[in-house]
């Protein structure tokens, strides 16, 4: 994979951090779709399908006071992201976006879909699995697909299928079709707590982050002493969920569990100074947390100041 735009260790960018406390978030300008950072010897590339503004109608547990303080304009920056990782001689994809745009972004980096060795899915919502199956064919023909056991079990459950109204069963069927397409190279894993998460491949650990879906996970990357936590949909509305982690979204399958996972993992990455990347974090999709005086967090976006 060719490093594109930016190569820099997440903790060694001198004078390049743009501090952005989301309380004061502004509307986003048009952004590039790809940018690359370094984590040890790993190269981590954002593959973004676009930036957008989210609304308060999906927020759960957000009081008028919270909204007025965190997002007074009534909306917040969001995005749809996947991440490509070059780890030694392996090319790894973390989440697969909405569709073919993910592959187009990879090609902008000089990487073909056939070169991807493994695809790690945080959960099986449509904006994370869209390029896995395109026109009935595997989007990544040589890749092993990694999915957590609780997520796999949920989508393969006949009881779950039977309990859904007819007009909602298509989503389950679509996910099953993906699992079937990759059945010869399907790795179903059991994640663990972030303190001792199991290693799936060298430098890639699977972290339980349940709540958004029954088997939602994050992936902790480590190379040469540097770390990055890819947390999937642990957050959707950074502007309000950082200062107020107790705010959830309407499409969390288990609100209480999602809040519990978010609070625990935010504390861990903040205490251990681990940079993070997220599927719905605005460009460039990565940053780090600091604790604020109100028992919440401030978020610092990674800087693109070394972009070429």
List each language-model region with its residue ranges.
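Active-site neighborhood of phospho(di)ester-bond hydrolases with catalytic His/Asp-centered motifs
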Residues: 93-97, 118-125, 146-148, 208-211, ...
């Amino acid at each position: 994979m060719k490093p594109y735009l930016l190569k820099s260790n997440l903790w060694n960018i001198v004078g390049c951090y743009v501090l952005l406390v989301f309380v004061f978030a502004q509307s986003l300008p048009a952004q590039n779709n790809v940018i690359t950072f370094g984590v040890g010897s790993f190269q981590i590339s954002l593959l973004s399908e676009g930036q957008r503004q989210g609304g308060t109608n999906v927020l759960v547990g957000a009081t008028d006071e919270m909204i007025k303080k965190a997002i007074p304009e009534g909306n917040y920056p969001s995005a749809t992201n996947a991440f490509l990782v070059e780890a030694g001689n392996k090319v790894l994809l973390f989440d697969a976006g909405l569709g073919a745009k993910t592959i187009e972004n990879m090609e902008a980096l000089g990487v073909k879909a056939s070169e991807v060795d493994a695809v790690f899915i945080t959960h099986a919502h449509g904006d994370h699995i869209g390029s896995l199956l395109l026109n009935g064919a595997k989007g990544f023909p040589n890749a092993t697909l990694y999915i957590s056991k609780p997520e796999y079990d949920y989508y393969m459950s006949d009881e779950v299928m039977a309990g859904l109204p007819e007009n909602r069963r298509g989503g389950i069927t679509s996910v099953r079709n993906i699992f079937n397409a990759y059945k010869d190279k399907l790795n179903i894993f059991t994640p663990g707590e972030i303190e001792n998460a199991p290693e799936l491949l060298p430098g890639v650990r699977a972290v339980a982050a349940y709540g958004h879906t029954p088997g939602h996970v994050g992936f902790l990357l480590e190379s040469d002493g540097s770390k990055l936590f890819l947390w999937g949909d642990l957050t959707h509305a950074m502007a309000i969920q950082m200062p107020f982690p107790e705010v959830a979204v309407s499409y969390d399958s288990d609100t209480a569990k999602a809040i519990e996972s978010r609070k625990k993992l935010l504390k861990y990455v903040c205490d251990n100074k681990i940079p993070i990347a997220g599927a719905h974090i605005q460009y460039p999709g990565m940053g780090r947390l600091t604790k604020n005086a109100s028992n919440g967090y401030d978020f610092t976006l990674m800087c693109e100041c070394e972009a070429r």
